[in-house]
Amino acid sequence: MKLLALGLSIVSVALAASRKSAPKGAFTVGKGQKFETISKAVAALSNTTTAEQLIFIQPGTYAEQVFIPKLSGPLTVQGYTTDDSKYSKNQVTIVASESQKTQPGNDLTATLRVWTSDFKLYNVNVRNAFGEGSQAVAVSANAGVSPLRVFSLLT
C-alpha cells in the first residue's frame, strides 16, 4: 500500500509540471521569436496537414483577437506556466475589447474564436475587456472543442 501511495504522489507531482519551453516543432510566439503575435502563428499553420500542430506562447499579454480557422488536424495551444495545474500560475493572457456595439454577432465579439475541431487550450487566460453595456464574450467555439484546461475566462 505504501508503494501505491508513493506512486500516486509521484504521478501527481509529475502532472503539476511547468511549461517553460516550447516542445520540438512548435510554433513559438513571443518577443524576439519568429512570431510576435498569436494570430501570425495561426496564419502560418497548415490547414491541410492531418498531423498535430502546436503553438507555444511565451509569457506576456497579447492584445489581439485570435481566429482559429478550420484545420484538417488537431491543434494544441500551450501557454507558458510555472505550474500547469493552477490557472493562477498562467503567464499568458489574450485580451481584446470587442462587443456587439462594434460587431454584429457574439462570435465576432470573442477574443478567441475557434472554428476547428480537435482544439486544445492549456494554461492561457482569455479576456474580453469591453466591460458593461453590451454583449461581449471571451471564447466562441463553433466546432468540437476538446479540453480547455487550466485557464480562466474573463469578461
Predicted regions: what is each one?
Residues M1-R19:
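Fungal secretory targeting signals
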Residues S134-T155:
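Eukaryote-skewed repeat-based solenoidal scaffolds used as protein-protein interaction platforms
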